[in-house]
C-alpha cells in the first residue's frame, strides 16, 4: 500500500512539474471580449481562461488620447466594440508587444475601416496596404468628416514626435 502511494505521488509530482500553462507570443485568432479601450486604435481583450492582450488595430493610426480628436476617437471605438466580442486576425507583434490585428465587431464590420470612415483615424499605409482603407480615407477627407474638418490636421505620428510646447497647442 505504501509503495502504491509513493508511485502515485511520484506520478502526480511528475505531471505537476511537466504542466506549464500555455503562453502566447501574441493573441491567437478568434473571437474575444473587449475589456478595455485605451485610445482610438488600441484596446485590450480577454482570452480565456484569464489572459489579456493589447490589440492594435492594423492599418490605422488614430489621434493620441491628449491630441485633438483623441477623445472622440476613443469614445467612437468604445461605441463600436466596448464590452463586446470582437473577431481578431493577428498579423504581427509591434515593438511595444501589442498584437497588430484586423478586427471585426459582432456585426462583422471592419473596425479599422469604420474608424477611417468616421474621420477618426488615418490610413496607416506604411504598415498595411488595403485599397478600401485608402479609398475610405479619401472619401472622409472630401466629406470633411471628423478630424478632416480641420484644414491641416496633425497626424498622430507628427504629434508623437513634436516637442511638448507644440503638443499643448493642439490639445
Which ranges hold each PLM region?
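Small beta-barrel nucleic-acid-binding modules, primarily SNase/OB-fold domains
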Residues: 2-171
Amino acid at each position: 500500500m505504501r509503495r502504491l502511494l509513493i508511485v502515485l505521488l511520484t506520478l502526480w509530482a511528475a505531471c505537476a512539474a511537466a504542466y506549464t500553462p500555455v503562453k502566447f507570443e501574441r493573441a491567437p485568432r478568434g473571437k474575444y471580449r473587449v475589456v478595455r479601450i485605451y485610445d482610438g486604435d488600441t484596446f485590450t481583450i480577454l482570452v480565456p481562461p484569464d489572459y489579456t492582450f493589447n490589440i492594435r488595430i492594423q492599418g490605422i493610426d488614430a489621434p493620441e488620447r491628449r491630441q485633438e480628436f483623441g477623445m472622440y476617437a476613443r469614445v467612437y471605438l468604445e461605441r463600436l466594440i466596448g464590452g463586446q466580442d470582437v473577431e481578431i486576425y493577428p498579423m504581427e507583434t509591434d515593438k511595444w508587444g501589442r498584437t497588430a490585428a484586423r478586427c471585426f465587431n459582432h456585426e462583422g464590420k471592419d473596425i479599422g475601416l469604420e474608424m477611417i470612415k468616421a474621420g477618426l483615424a488615418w490610413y496607416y499605409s506604411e504598415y498595411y496596404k488595403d485599397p478600401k482603407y485608402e479609398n475610405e480615407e479619401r472619401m472622409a477627407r472630401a466629406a470633411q468628416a471628423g478630424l478632416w474638418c480641420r484644414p491641416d490636421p496633425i497626424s498622430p505620428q507628427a504629434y508623437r514626435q513634436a516637442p511638448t510646447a507644440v503638443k499643448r497647442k493642439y490639445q
